[in-house]
Amino acid sequence: MNYKLLGKILGKIMILEGILMMAPLAISIIYKEYNKNVYSLGGVKNILAFAIPIVLLFIIGFALQFTKPQRKSLYQKEGFALVAMVWIVMTLFGAIPFVINRDIPNYIDACFEIMSGFTTTGASIIDDITLMSHSTLFWRSFSHWIGGMGILVFVLIFIPESKDGSAMHLLRAESPGPQVGKIVSKMRATARILYLIYLGMTVILASILMIGPLIDTNAALQATGIDYSGDKVFHALITAFGCAGTGGFGSIPNSLQYFTPFAQYTVSIALLLFGINFTMYYLILIGKIKDVFRSEEIKTYFSIIIAAVGLIFISLKLGGIIDSFAITQNYDTTEEAFRHSLFQVASILTTAGFSSTDYDVWPVLSKMVLVICMLMGAMAGSTAGGIKTSRIVIAVKGSYINIRKLINPRYVPKAKFEGKLLEEKTINDVFAFITMYAGVFVLAMLIISFDPVNGTTVIINSDAGAGREVTHGFFSNFSAVASCMSNIGPGFEAVGPYASFSGYNWFSTIILTLTMLIGRLEILPVFILFSPRTWKKI
């Protein structure tokens, strides 16, 4: 292992995290959180919460720059291990502010929260978001934006181009999906293009949210007793960060329930756009629009969206006829039912995890559609999690090929994906990924099934009615693992859209934190990092 080079790159990441932490530090100063009388040091804790880790990151990061590696290249296993190390280090330091300012005093819970942010999961252990400081709300949502495109993708802009493929190893390890490649000849140029598109879309979305009506302040005031008529820029930024990274952390109670219909439609469309492979936007920019319309994955992606929205909309309108489940959520108009159907499909399929309503009380058919969307995810090369649309398409075609071979051993596969013949290796890689995905999923479920929280009752207060009792059981654990593995956020029942993950004990919290990392980095980098063979001298 090239320890010195790993340390040097890790040091660059730590310096970068320290620089990024200056943003929530600025928010703390802007909102004068140092004037707040909180705990023994008063509001100074909100300043120290970010100042202390910034100093630590700079000291360690710059110290690591003095190492002189003999080899300036990375092998594939080193690149994959480095990516996992980077995300773990970012989390360990990123959790410190929550502990210092006492917003999340338990360090394990704080690591869960910030890992949920960096991996764009959006699962939270916070029960009452109104008690959080502005700087905490900003940092955890800003982490969505940081992790959405990928931490190392950003660093690739500054790492010198190498001829040995080191940069490609890092990009492959961090970018979601079965196929990763350059969109232009040089990796640094590819990284710049990706981030410029990402930044541009974020700025456009934030501007639209700032200009249009954002929060229904009367409804929010009546339900929460808090006046949200001010701070529109802050709430628009928080929402834009969550959409861009397809995260899910919000800035007011009950996610986006109290947002205006305009804002909910805007977020729905934005999420679907951020769930598209960013290569498609590059093709549009260079005038190759026909190639976008020929994409098999994008056709499948929008077909799934239309089918899912249609099924949920019909289920909501005809719930009493097709489902004996007692629906406690009623929508006054057809438009409202359609809006919530579109919003939740967009949010769950792109693994954002925002909620506009309590979908946990929807008919069984609607909930099953959302569970399927949870596992599938959006397109490869997007900021979304899940298995990915491309893998689903390849798996279906691979299964068809295997069935044809069983019927006719002389059958020669001619299946294509995106205009290219599907190689047997690609199909096998997809099947291997799905097998590992299922294995981790089942193992995580078994572990958290020992948690004492199972069998307890949780009280849910939502727009479907206050004081609804939910038992923490199998479906709660299933959806908790699914939401963490697919980087979605809320699940169903005791971890539903109006609940949190705070009921789990420390060990289950650690398991779910690792599950989020495994899901975001798509298994292999984490497995390679913890494999003893990786660290043996050859």
Predicted regions: what they are:
Residues 1-538:
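Membrane-proximal intracellular helices of multi-pass ion channels
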